[in-house]
UniProtKB/Swiss-Prot annotation:
The lineage of its organism: Eukaryota, Metazoa, Chordata, Craniata, Vertebrata. It is found in: Nucleus. This is Zinc finger protein 227. It comes from Homo sapiens (Human). May be involved in transcriptional regulation. GO terms for cellular component: nucleus. The keyword Metal-binding applies. Pfam families: KRAB, zf-C2H2. It comes from the Eukaryota. Belongs to the krueppel C2H2-type zinc-finger protein family. Its main location: nucleus.
Length: 799
């Protein structure tokens, strides 16, 4: 096409110069990528759209760029669902649309007498009128396509076309008055160029924003005489010569992308750094409103600044306004977000699901917090002790421990708490509220976590395992406390004596030793205890409650410790060994008590008689000798006992139970001690030796009685005549002389006896029983004394 020169009037040149010097939409546009747009909330998107539309309207008002930018259309498309026409309705309008496009396309594109600026203004004016007028049938998304081979004007889908006979398009290959020839960079061939009218009739991006024609319009300030130029090149007026189409000699050092001319290259690194540049400071300030950091609204109460979306919610904190109400329960919320999350309580909706364990959550914040359980991420560290936390709020609460801060005070007892949740739970101690009930046994709890742990008592679940010994626990805290057995850690120190304890509760109990305080009193017997748990355990003595049952034999126990001790009988396990004698024990406490036998240590001394004991339980039982206390009463005869074991043994008198059987002779015994002594009669074992004469005895009591023969001690005095005896049995026999009382009567002959042993010996006369046999001649005797007398015949001792 031959080059042409166009002389424009002076006024038109001045107008064009002013138009070219004005800012373009690209200068004021704020461009976000799709990824950046997704990070904006609804309020920020609306603000972004308003800013873009305002800038766009300002440019339209001065007659520049009457086409809505892609970015604005994209935002509007995300917020509004366009009404879609049916295929029948759309096809009926294609012909009218094509006719309208044909009119102004042929009118201006075929006119070779117009300059490129005039063509631009005329086409823009027609397109603007089509946008504003209601007579136009053009819709969003339509386009004009000029075929590269046949010069057709087609709709976007290519299903309807209007052929332009032998039409040349000088607009695409126009030699402007400045002397530069402008060609499209990618799609210009010998005869035509595609034009798309997208998003409210926006001209194709290659022509509008990227073509050399568009670049020239922005930079050229004054029309110049046109010069001839070879096809496909762009030659400037001065020394700035641009390269042939397609060549990009300026590469980016970061990603290798090429640019056809160098002015574009300094702006490209902002893609990698995320930096955004603006031609005017006002544009930068406008853009900064998009970011959440911008504080546009100031609170008069606190002086804090907030963006528009957060300001209303923050003001509600001061006013207490809760304008969003739940239709189901009437609960109020200061923000719509809080109401939406609350609705899920009624609907049960939990849209956030953990891929690791499948657990669902109603709030994304709870879901994110839960995920740190799997990742074990604890990004918030305490500067005092180095402890890590998954959330900053937990760190702030923890820091109150170091500061000693307890902002939540109980008005009833004055106790302070670091957390509001702990304070609310504590208040139930005063109100007695126990809203969490066990489905199995009906037991109530003041908060949920003890109920969860309690249910494991019924299920037997022990999810927390010790890595050292494999022992299981129902609670994580119990595992931590148990682990101190292996590490020997005792973090709780007594300020009085410096003694260390592995548990805080043990320290509190120990401190009562120094204070002597026993706050918990038994209403039945008045006995005091330093711990409420010990009082509850003690009350089972009066109620007879035995909640702990052995699964093997069905025996019941009042205390869990007694059950555990009993279970060792079935397992036979004795893991604690004495290093001195090798004897095994089921419990460490029994081992410690046994070791005092070797060391001779007796730390428990009676202040009344100065008698010492190696075990605390023996000391407490002994004290009842002085106090006369006999708390264990027989329900049949009312007899009292100082020990529960004494009561249990006594009850066998009424029941006739003799659980201990001799394997040799089959004789039964009520007491284990009697059974042991009896067995020594068969074995001949006499472990207790007299140091004076070497005589042996099967019982320690008999040894003590014998030693009085050597010492001459006779502690048992008759109050009637003052006669003394070494044995209490001898005193009782003697008392029958004064009273002549014979309480024990023989049912066969009516003879009376002062002692039950005498009655039993007498009854053998009637039964013919002779239990004492001579080992040498097998002769039988009714009485032991007769056997002893007979044995002297064999030994040759004088009778």
């Amino acid at each position: 096409m031959p080059s042409q020169n166009y002389d424009l009037p002076q006024k038109k040149q001045e107008k064009m110069t002013k138009f070219q010097e004005a800012v373009t939409f690209k200068d004021v546009a704020v461009v976000f990528s799709r990824e950046e747009l997704r990070l904006l909330d609804l309020t920020q998107r609306k603000l972004y759209r308003d800013v873009m539309v305002e800038n766009f309207k300002n440019l339209v008002a001065v007659g520049h760029l009457p086409f809505q930018p892609d970015m604005v259309s994209q935002l509007e498309a995300e917020e509004k669902l366009w009404m879609m026409e049916t295929e029948t309705q759309r096809s009926s309008k294609h012909q009218n649309k094509m006719e309208t496009l044909q009119k102004f396309a042929l009118k201006y594109l075929s006119n070779q007498e117009l300059s490129c600026w005039q063509i631009w203004k005329q086409v823009a004016s027609e397109l603007t009128r089509c946008l504003q007028g209601k007579s136009s049938q053009l819709l969003q998304g339509d386009s004009i396509q000029v075929s590269e081979n046949e010069n057709n004007i087609m709709n976007p889908k290519g299903d309807s076309s209007i052929y332009i006979e032998n039409q040349e398009f000088p607009f695409w290959r126009t030699q402007h008055s400045c002397g530069n020839t402008y060609l499209s960079e990618s799609q210009i061939q010998s005869r035509g160029k595609q034009i798309d009218v997208k998003n409210n009739l926006q001209i194709h991006e290659d022509f509008m924003k990227k073509s050399p024609f568009h670049e020239h319009i922005k930079t050229d300030t004054e029309p110049k005489p046109c010069k001839g130029n070879e096809y496909g090149k762009i030659i400037s007026d001065g020394s700035n010569q641009k390269l042939p189409l397609g060549e990009k000699p300026h590469p980016c050092g970061e990603c290798g992308r090429g640019f056809s001319y160098s002015p574009r290259l300094p702006l490209h690194p902002n893609v990698h750094t995320g930096e955004k540049c603006f031609s005017q400071s006002s544009h930068l300030r406008t853009h900064q409103r998009i970011h959440p950091g911008e504080k546009l609204n100031r609170c008069h109460e606190s002086g804090d600044c907030f963006n528009k979306s957060s300001f209303h919610s923050y003001q509600s904190n001061h006013t207490g306004e809760k304008s969003y109400r739940c239709d189901s329960c009437g609960k109020g919320f200061s923000s719509s977000t809080g109401l939406i999350i609350h609705y899920r309580t009624h609907t049960g909706e939990k849209p956030y699901k953990c891929e690791e364990c499948g657990k669902c959550f109603s709030q994304s914040s709870n879901f994110q917090c839960h995920q740190r359980v799997h990742t074990e991420e604890k990004p918030y560290k305490c500067e005092e002790c180095g402890k890590g936390f998954g959330w900053s709020v937990n760190l702030r609460v923890h820091q109150r421990v170091h500061r000693g801060e307890k902002p939540y005070k109980c008005e009833e007892c004055g106790k302070g708490f670091t957390q509001a949740a702990h304070f609310h739970i504590h208040q139930r101690v005063h109100t007695g509220e126990k809203p969490y009930k066990c489905d199995v046994c009906g037991k109530g709890f003041s908060h949920n976590s003890p109920l969860i742990c309690h249910r494991r008592v019924h299920t037997g679940e022990k999810p927390y395992k010790c890595e050292a010994c494999g022992k299981g626990f129902t609670r994580n805290t119990d595992l931590h406390i148990h682990f101190r057995v292996h590490t020997g850690e005792k973090p709780y120190k007594c300020k009085e004596c410096g003694k260390g304890f592995s548990q805080a509760s043990n320290l509190q109990v120990h401190q009562n030793v120094h204070t002597g305080e026993k706050r918990f009193k038994c209403e039945t017997c008045g006995k005091g205890f330093s711990q409420s748990s010990k009082l509850q355990t003690h009350q089972r003595v009066h109620t007879g409650e035995k909640p702990y049952r052995c699964d093997v034999c069905g025996k019941d126990f009042s205390y869990s410790s007694n059950l555990k001790l009993h279970q060792v009988i079935h397992t036979g396990e004795k893991p604690y060994k004495c290093e001195e004698c090798g004897k095994g024990f089921s419990w460490r406490s029994n081992l410690h008590a046994h070791q005092r036998v070797h060391s001779g240590e007796k730390p428990y001394k009676c202040e009344q008689c100065d008698k010492s004991f190696s075990q605390a339980i023996d000391f407490r039982v002994h004290q009842r000798v002085h106090t006369g206390e006999k708390p264990y009463k027989c329900g049949v005869c009312g007899k009292g006992f100082s020990q529960s074991s004494g009561l249990q043994s006594h009850q066998r008198v009424h029941t006739g139970e003799k659980p201990y059987k001799c394997d040799v002779c089959g004789k039964g015994f009520r007491y284990s001690s009697q059974f042991i002594y009896h067995q020594r009669g068969h074995t001949g074992e006499k472990p207790y030796k007299c140091e004076e004469c070497g005589k042996g005895f099967g019982r320690s009591l008999n040894l003590r009685h014998h030693q009085r023969v050597h010492t001459g001690e006779k502690p048992h005095i008759c109050e009637e005549c003052g006669k003394a005896f070494s044995l209490p049995s001898n005193l009782r026999v003697h008392l029958g002389v004064h009273t002549r009382e014979k309480l024990f009567k023989c049912e066969e002959c009516g003879k009376g006896f002062s002692q039950s042993a005498r009655l039993e010996a007498h009854q053998r006369v009637h039964t013919g029983e002779k239990p004492y046999k001579c080992d040498i001649c097998d002769k039988d005797f009714r009485h032991r004394s007769r056997l002893t007398y007979h044995q002297k015949v064999h030994t040759g001792k004088k009778l």
